[in-house]
Amino acid sequence: MNLPSEVEIFGHCYQICFSSEMNDEELGRCDQTRQIIFLSKEQGADSLRDTLLHEIIHAVHWLMGLNDKSTEEEFTARTTTGLRSVMLQNPEVVEYVLGR
């Protein structure tokens, strides 16, 4: 499956694109002002999926007005890892939760 070019979050359309301007410690970045999620190409497929979800959670955090920067990164990192693990191990639950 190819990387999507955009994601809608609470009615806000964020572009998803690769960036070569990341520093060595960054795998992704969410630019709230320009509504762009930047991802580093320097990561494997599973890491890329994890990073995309991580940056989406940053956008959700921002759009919901949760402005506590002191805990945002830790919360986002732990939530991403836990949520993606549950989703991978329980596809039937994901299908049920997303059902309409």
Residue ranges and their predicted role:
Residues 1-47, 63-100:
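Metalloprotease/metallohydrolase-associated module, dominated by Zn2+-dependent proteases
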Residues 50-62:
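Active-site recognition of the HExxH zinc-binding catalytic motif
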